[in-house]
Design a protein with these regions (language model features):
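Charged catalytic and DNA/RNA-contacting regions of genome-maintenance
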Residues: 2-332, 337, 341-345
């Protein structure tokens, strides 16, 4: 990048903000448009199929530019995030009319990633959008799984093999790891979007403090996760990641629970694939098991069904309890219709 003094004032501001978010595509608000420049413009053009144009940059000549009207943000943002991009939204922080010929003050107001997304346009309501975090310590590993949109927060700790199995059960949209293991993680999990985070976020004391603050407690004993330090480190790191992406004060994230290794049937990625539980081996034309089973009346029900298929329980009493509920509704069609109606009315 050339010296900032060679840029026009607007692009000088753009590159200054971009330098603070080098790993994100920066959507920079200019009047009624969101614009990208230089390498980000090329990326935006390729992902969205937009025409790549150029903006004058004073002594440096022209630089690549691409953009779209601000009112189209809800249309294009999901496409960018689903393509695996981290997107920083840079808005005008003051009324341009009051700037009085000065450069309008701008700043990043929100960062969205594959694992941190909100709203109907961004999410598939029938599926959890998991953000996962991993902390390694020799042969052992701690994991955390967070759906920021619903507040569902799960942790686990055990062998690396066990955690690997969990990853393919949860199928997270994004995986956060310590920066020093990022390259190794990319090689090990090529199918996941992997984000590096500074090591301090995984330090036990800092992570525990972040997690307690988010949950509004002084101790984690009430959640029965305090004896699993690597899991707590992963969970705390995810809270730090939320803060770094300008997502603070999420009151729906108020509880956390541990996944008990001995309570479920564990299936590896090959089992999920061979049984076609979530994806058909015939591609988009085929039908998976969840496609056949999912007749749920609400997105919440669909998410729960997928969770049950991901983590089949071993407890016979719990299984029989589920069967009893199914039998009740099979024998009482009027009650079934009433329940369906009530659930749908709440959506």
């Amino acid at each position: 990048m050339a010296k900032a003094s060679e840029d026009t004032p607007l692009l000088r501001q753009y590159f200054s903000i971009k330098a603070q978010h080098p790993d994100a595509l920066l959507l920079y608000r200019v009047g009624d448009f969101y614009e990208c420049y230089s390498a980000d413009a090329v990326t935006l053009s390729k992902v969205l199929g937009m025409v790549l144009t150029r903006r004058n940059n004073g002594e440096k000549g022209d630089t690549e530019m691409a953009g779209f009207p601000h009112h189209a943000l809800d249309t294009y943002l999901p496409k960018l995030v689903r393509s695996g991009l981290k997107v920083a939204i840079c808005d005008q922080l003051e009324d341009p009319k009051l700037a009085q010929n000065k450069l309008v003050k701008r700043g990043v107001t929100e960062i969205l990633t594959p694992g941190i997304a909100f709203g109907e346009t961004m999410l598939e309501g029938k599926e959890h959008n998991w953000l996962a975090g991993l902390t390694y310590d020799g042969p052992e590993c701690g994991a955390a799984f967070l759906d920021a949109s619903t507040g569902t927060f799960r942790v686990a700790q055990g062998s690396v093999e066990y955690i690997n199995t969990l990853l393919y059960s949860f199928r997270p949209s994004e995986l956060v790891v310590q920066r020093d293991v990022w390259r190794t993680a990319r090689e090990k999990y090529p199918e996941f979007c992997i984000t590096p985070l500074d090591e301090w976020a995984f330090v036990p004391d800092a992570a525990r403090e972040k997690l307690c603050s988010q949950l509004g407690v002084s101790s984690l004993k009430g959640f029965a996760v305090d004896r699993y330090p690597l899991a707590v480190c992963s969970a705390g790191a995810l809270v730090s990641y939320l803060e770094q992406t300008h997502h603070t004060g999420l009151r729906n994230i108020c509880s956390i629970s541990r996944i008990d290794e001995g309570s479920f049937v564990w299936m590896d990625r090959f089992t999920f694939r061979n049984l076609e539980i979530f994806q058909s081996n015939s591609g988009t034309e085929g039908t998976s098991l969840v496609d056949v089973l999912d007749r749920c009346s609400s997105p919440m029900g669909s998410r729960l069904l997928r969770e049950w298929l991901s983590l089949p329980i071993l407890d016979i009493r719990a299984l029989n309890s589920r069967y009893d509920v199914v039998q009740f509704f099979c024998d009482n069609e009027e009650a079934l219709d009433e329940m369906r109606s009530r659930i749908r009315s709440e959506e």
